[in-house]
Amino acid sequence: MDKLNIGGKQLESRLFIGTGKYGSNEILPKVIESSKSQVITVALRRVDLNSREENILNYIKDDCVLLPNTSGARNAEEAVRLARLSKAAGCGNWIKIEAISDNKYLLPDNYETIKATEILAKEGFYVFPYMNPDLMDAKRFVAAGAAAVMPLGAPIGTNKGLKTEEMIKILIEEIKEVPIIVDAGIGKPSDACKAMEMGADAVLLNTAIATAENPILMGEAFKNAVEAGRKAYLAGFGTEAKFANASSPLIGFLR
């Protein structure tokens, strides 16, 4: 499968996974292995930046790319502060911006996220903004220096699938400068496959794997789904027909 060039790196896997909601941290390395994910996102509020003891980072392989996120930030100022703390603590220059002041639906504030993106991109961060799928805002993220655009498929943690499918299709069609990563709401491997068939460059998910009865097996299922969806997109779909059309012609068969 073709590689994903993003944030100054070349990746084999187009499946990004999160680290929350697992029954224990011990299962995380096994999920990373089964999913073959290379990009692992971690909420900075779950990371003890002053200690390596019983730290979530201890369970993430050294060859994985760490994508810290600013979960808990309510505005641009708080997101920027968390990003700078992350970089100072040695967590790298990749940052996923989450700026959410809505505590009920946890929908991202595009305005505050764009402000944070512009500030951090100028400071040398590769910024991955979590956003509501709006075309004009997506263009503003690109202009602000985002390394990718990350539209939500459904409210975070709901496992409801691609409820914003038509909006995401518009972003895929119109935003060519940076990768499109579908983030949040993906509940089943078929959702991930569909996102990749649509032309998304990658998907990021957490709850669907972490809350599965068998997270290790589910990680593998998502790996296969993402690969299948990407290959189907690259292969190009056959044309749809209004009427039935036999695969083998019947003319002359019964002479």
Swiss-Prot record:
<feature type="binding site">
    <location>
        <begin position="206"/>
        <end position="207"/>
    </location>
    <ligand>
        <name>1-deoxy-D-xylulose 5-phosphate</name>
    </ligand>
</feature>
<keyword id="KW-0963">Cytoplasm</keyword>
<dbReference type="GO" id="GO:0009229">
    <property type="term" value="P:thiamine diphosphate biosynthetic process"/>
</dbReference>
<dbReference type="InterPro" id="IPR033983">
    <property type="entry name" value="Thiazole_synthase_ThiG"/>
</dbReference>
<protein>
    <recommendedName>
        <fullName>Thiazole synthase</fullName>
        <ecNumber>2.8.1.10</ecNumber>
    </recommendedName>
</protein>
<feature type="active site" description="Schiff-base intermediate with DXP">
    <location>
        <position position="96"/>
    </location>
</feature>
<comment type="subunit">
    <text>Homotetramer. Forms heterodimers with either ThiH or ThiS.</text>
</comment>
<dbReference type="GO" id="GO:0005737">
    <property type="term" value="C:cytoplasm"/>
</dbReference>
<dbReference type="Pfam" id="PF05690">
    <property type="entry name" value="ThiG"/>
</dbReference>
<dbReference type="InterPro" id="IPR008867">
    <property type="entry name" value="ThiG"/>
</dbReference>
<comment type="function">
    <text>Catalyzes the rearrangement of 1-deoxy-D-xylulose 5-phosphate (DXP) to produce the thiazole phosphate moiety of thiamine. Sulfur is provided by the thiocarboxylate moiety of the carrier protein ThiS. In vitro, sulfur can be provided by H(2)S.</text>
</comment>
<keyword id="KW-0784">Thiamine biosynthesis</keyword>
<comment type="similarity">
    <text>Belongs to the ThiG family.</text>
</comment>
<dbReference type="GO" id="GO:1990107">
    <property type="term" value="F:thiazole synthase activity"/>
</dbReference>
<keyword id="KW-0704">Schiff base</keyword>
<feature type="binding site">
    <location>
        <begin position="184"/>
        <end position="185"/>
    </location>
    <ligand>
        <name>1-deoxy-D-xylulose 5-phosphate</name>
    </ligand>
</feature>
<comment type="pathway">
    <text>Cofactor biosynthesis; thiamine diphosphate biosynthesis.</text>
</comment>
<feature type="binding site">
    <location>
        <position position="157"/>
    </location>
    <ligand>
        <name>1-deoxy-D-xylulose 5-phosphate</name>
    </ligand>
</feature>
<dbReference type="InterPro" id="IPR013785">
    <property type="entry name" value="Aldolase_TIM"/>
</dbReference>
<keyword id="KW-0808">Transferase</keyword>
